[in-house]
């Protein structure tokens, strides 16, 4: 596909997503895939347009075939497992097993971390931990209307910028496809939500964004700090999940069970409206993403001090909301 035709991708993804949502709202009414009377069609409206947009790119251009095929097929598998989970509520072990299967398929097609300082086996292990962590982080983040989709959109935009700056056509294609679908989804998912994302959507989002981070270009040898770029772009879901796990372990509860320990829920308990919480989460994600983009370009290792300061601020905010939530 010629570069000057890339603008077609987000429009294709957007309008196909709109069609799927409108048809899905009608089709899933009074059927199994509903929650509180609201259809769980968000995953389909994000996953299918992204997949078909990728297939179109493969049809018109063979230069991205290997890695794009790997991400498309493995993310489709993750989406299918998510639909099954939405319908039958898989056990934790079954979820981890299905996610591992999708990750294996991805790695077998050549998509993994390629950190030059370590060998192949450590890179594969890091890939597993990274993708399974981000996939479940977005699943945990899907606790409020518009939240997971909004955070994903900001992170996707940041990945688009890194891909554009580095001339990474694969990342550009993926972010354009995902961005178009996310815009249409958010129109129907902002509070009060008319559709839900479901596990199929949150797992797909986390998986694609995590995979996108792997195929992006960050760190030539002269810019080692750029390795932190994807960690910052996805900083909010990572931090939220890490603190969630720490809190639950301290309270001797399973990290995998649903609870109200999330940062967004604590803001809600403190009296913030849902729209104000979304604004706060948007700003946090935007700041983290901006820092990630800055780190991808700096040469001076002293910039690590900036990283530590931001981490300290983020930790302080979460601890403060944690104490406020406990008092409420």
Predicted regions and their residues:
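A short, structure-level motif marking secondary-structure boundaries and short turns
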Residues: 9-11, 87, 119, 248-250, ...
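Membrane-interface capping segments at transmembrane-helix boundaries
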Residues: 25-27, 190, 249, 316-328
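Cytosolic, membrane-interface loops and tails of multi-pass inner-membrane proteins
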Residues: 22-39, 243-275
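Extended hydrophobic-aromatic, low-complexity segments
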Residues: 222-224, 245, 256-258, 276, ...
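"…together with the soluble PPM/PP2C metallo-phosphatase catalytic core" -> "…together
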Residues: 2-242
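Alpha-helical transmembrane segments of integral membrane proteins
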Residues: 261, 268-291, 296
């Amino acid at each position: 596909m010629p570069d000057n035709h890339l603008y077609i991708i987000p429009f294709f993804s957007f309008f196909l997503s709109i069609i799927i949502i409108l048809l899905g709202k009608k089709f899933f009414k009074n059927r199994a895939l509903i929650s509180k009377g609201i259809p769980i069609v968000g995953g389909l409206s994000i996953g299918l347009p992204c997949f078909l947009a990728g297939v179109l790119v493969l049809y018109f251009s063979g230069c991205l075939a290997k890695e794009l095929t790997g991400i498309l097929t493995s993310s489709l598998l993750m989406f299918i497992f998510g639909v099954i989970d939405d319908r039958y509520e898989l056990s934790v072990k079954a979820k981890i097993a299905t996610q591992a299967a999708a990750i294996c398929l991805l790695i077998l097609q050549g998509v993994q971390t390629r950190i030059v300082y370590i060998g192949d086996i450590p890179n594969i292990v890091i890939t597993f931990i990274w993708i399974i962590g981000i996939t479940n982080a977005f699943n945990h983040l899907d606790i409020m209307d518009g939240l997971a989709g909004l955070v994903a959109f900001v992170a996707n935009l940041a990945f688009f910028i890194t891909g554009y700056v580095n001339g990474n056509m694969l990342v550009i294609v993926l972010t354009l496809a995902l961005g178009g679908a996310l815009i249409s989804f958010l129109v129907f998912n902002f509070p009060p939500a008319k559709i839900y994302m479901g596990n199929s959507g949150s797992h797909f989002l986390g998986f694609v964004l995590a995979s996108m981070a792997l195929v992006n270009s960050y760190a030539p040898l002269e810019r080692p700090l750029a390795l932190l770029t994807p960690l910052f772009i996805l900083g909010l879901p990572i931090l939220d999940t890490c603190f969630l796990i720490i809190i639950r372990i301290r309270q001797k509860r399973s990290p995998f069970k649903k609870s109200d320990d999330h940062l967004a829920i604590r803001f809600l308990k403190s009296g913030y409206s849902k729209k104000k919480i979304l604004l706060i989460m948007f700003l946090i994600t935007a700041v983290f993403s901006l820092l990630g983009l800055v780190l991808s370009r700096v040469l001076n290792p002293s910039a690590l001090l900036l990283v530590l300061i931001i981490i300290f601020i983020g930790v302080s905010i979460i601890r403060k909301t944690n104490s406020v939530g406990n008092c409420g």
